[in-house]
């Protein structure tokens, strides 16, 4: 299935760019621009492209702009989506690091939902925050929060993870309770892939898989491993795999990625990419 990754690049000088991209070593090439793979949306894009190659499917396309926290690039992306919706004909979209803006979020969501058929919608990071804040979380097919972000989704009053109430930020063994609470408050997508010491795959409020192994503690301090998980599930969904199976395989592959790479905390996502084929093939067995 055709897929579009929507996010940002942490550079003030990066223009709005859209289209096919390719990965070469630790660099992405998109619309005449070069992007170094570190973390954030570039990490997601790199992993999705590498995984698509393993799956023998076309790599997703991307729509990104530079944003270092001012929101200027994010607003350019939002506006481009709304103004060009007739040309956004992908079967699925993965929304990533964009500055949360409820008004723009709602315009994007409504225009996409007006399509027939409506595309699959995946959200992580800043766009997931906007989806929750808008009250439209249940309109999404998949959120990919980490253990801290599931506490935010479970808090019906927090406008941002920074403001999640302390009584919800306890031990990670409370994640099942927080998942239940997020659904009760209608702050969860139809499916969740929660990354943590245990990875949870959830469908309409019911946990359908828990993944605990292989356990590679050195992966935790590496920036971008949540982005790699979202990149993996993006590629798997784009291959046509069913949602819960895509989530389970992505979680397994992300763990095998750490196992085969044997990383140190100094690693970045680019250092993990050479091990992705082996990790994904193992997860697919």
Residue map of PLM features:
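Charged C-terminal helix
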Residues: 255-285
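Short catalytic helix/loop segments, enriched in acidic residues and glycine
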Residues: 18-45
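Conserved phosphate/ATP/ADP-binding segment of small-molecule kinases
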Residues: 130-208
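Positively charged, low-complexity intrinsically disordered leader regions
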Residues: 1-25
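Short, small-residue alpha-helix embedded
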Residues: 221-252
């Amino acid at each position: 299935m055709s897929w579009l990754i929507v996010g940002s690049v942490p550079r003030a000088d990066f223009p709005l760019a859209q289209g096919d991209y390719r990965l070469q070593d630790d660099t992405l090439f998109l619309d005449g621009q070069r992007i170094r793979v570190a973390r954030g949306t570039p990490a997601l894009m790199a992993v999705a492209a590498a995984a698509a190659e393993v799956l023998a499917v076309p790599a997703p396309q991307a729509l990104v702009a530079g944003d270092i926290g001012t929101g200027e690039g994010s607003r350019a992306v939002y506006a481009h989506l709304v103004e060009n919706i007739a040309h956004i004909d992908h079967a699925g979209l993965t929304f990533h690091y964009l500055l949360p803006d409820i008004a723009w979020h709602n315009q994007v969501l409504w225009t996409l939902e007006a399509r027939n058929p409506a595309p699959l919608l995946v959200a992580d990071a800043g766009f997931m925050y906007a989806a929750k804040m808008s009250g439209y979380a249940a309109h999404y097919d998949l959120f990919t929060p980490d253990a801290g972000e599931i506490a935010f989704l479970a808090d019906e009053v927090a406008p941002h993870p920074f403001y999640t109430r302390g009584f919800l930020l306890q031990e990670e063994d409370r994640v099942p309770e927080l998942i239940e609470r997020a659904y009760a408050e209608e702050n969860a997508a139809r499916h969740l892939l929660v990354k943590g010491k245990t990875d949870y795959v959830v469908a309409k409020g019911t946990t359908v898989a828990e993944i605990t192994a292989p356990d590679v503690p050195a992966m935790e301090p590496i920036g971008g491993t949540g982005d790699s998980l979202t990149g993996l599930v993006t590629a798997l969904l784009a291959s046509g795999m069913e949602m819960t199976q895509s989530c389970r395989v992505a979680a397994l592959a992300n763990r095998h990625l750490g196992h085969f790479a044997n990383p140190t905390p100094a690693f970045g996502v680019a250092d993990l990419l050479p091990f992705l084929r082996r990790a994904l093939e193992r997860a697919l067995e």
